[in-house]
Amino acid sequence: MLNPGEPDVQGVLDVLASAIARHEGPWDTIDLRPLAADAPDFPALLNAFRKAGLAVQSYFCFGNWYLRVGGRSYAEYFEALPSQLKNTVTRKRKQLEKLKSRIVVCDSETGLEEALRAYEQIYAVSWKIPEPYPHFISSLCRTCAGQGWLRLGVVYVDEQPVAAQIWIVHAGIAAIYKLAYDERFAKLSAGSILTAHLMQRAIDIDKVHEVDYLTGDDAYKRDWMSDRRERWGIMAFNLRTPRGLLAAARHFGAGAAKRALGAVRRLFGGQT
């Protein structure tokens, strides 16, 4: 949240939380997520909100699997994978090579629109729920392509797109942002083949030091990654508004919310 070199993290957050608490505009809750709970500014933010008279609750968001490359080549990384995954990738890659298949990775504006159409076609027939903001992904990809950050991979079989993944590479980190495959071709394991292909590119060509699978504790992620960390959230409740007080009562129980309200009244001189 803050620059790690900030000399007075607690002081800065105290001022911020106090300004938020005293803001006259109507607000009920603040929900900050996802955050690194092991970062020094996480407990500092909790303390700042409490000192400002807000009811505060931290909560678990999700597990985050990631890979520490550690200077390895892709070959060294692949050799350390679970044997079942290695066998699947090796066997299915040979199977795909016997078919009329190809893998295309779009990393610039050239060919981007075709790659986006392929991704959207795959996504529409996958298990994924529809995007709430349909144009967001395409706009994000165009922005990333313009900056050289995009790695949009598509697997074609008989010129039909069957699997796609969106990776974003920046500052030495490859983030696996989106993936989907056509379930009618599930037996080909095209998604796994594409992951291996993009992983090789990220490690050997992009020279990343970390690959991040982002949100979720899906079982398959631990096979590809080396480490897991947690992301947490902080929710702060404005006890000076009816909705904020009601939300706090739902989260903490009516008794705890009532005690917190008493503390707020004392803090603000009896005004709520």
Name each model feature, range by range:
Residues 1-60, 169-229:
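Acyl-donor binding region in acyl/amide transferases
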Residues 7-9, 109-113, 242:
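A short acidic, often aromatic-flanked loop/helix-cap motif at beta-alpha or helix-coil junctions
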Residues 24, 29-187:
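A conserved beta-strand-loop-helix scaffold within acyl/acetyltransferase catalytic domains
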Residues 42, 47-76, 80, 206-269:
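Active-site/acyl-donor-binding loops of N-acyltransferases
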Residues 122, 180-182, 191-194, 240, ...:
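Short, charged/polar low-complexity linear motifs in solvent-exposed/disordered segments
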